[in-house]
Amino acid sequence: MKKNLGQVFTDKWLVNLILDFSGYTDNHILDKKIIEPSCGDGAFLLEIVKRYIDSALSKNWSIQQIKEGLENHIYAIEIDKKYYKEAILKLNKLLEKYQITGVKWNILNEDALKIHQYNGQMDFVIGNP
């Protein structure tokens, strides 16, 4: 579905397919940094966070360890303030299911083309093709 600013929102099945093909699966993600440079309302982020939490829980991580992992390994950028806020709301709602609160998300409300602070620091750069 296409919106203003040329935004294209990704269906969940395609999100999962892209994450699977990229290798962002199971035990290979807890020490990896990932960024979604145009996160929209959070389609990729929601699945990324879910996979991260599920992987951490399978390794018996504490809630505090998971929270720190989310804050230090998952990044995103969204230019549209409406979708930036919506993505954060959806992520916090997802966290409620896991009884995790107070995550300080590394999500910027900026133009990804003008952000260079993450260059060369990420293991995965994921987004709508």
Which residue ranges define each predicted feature?
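SAM-dependent methyltransferase catalytic region
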Residues: 1-129
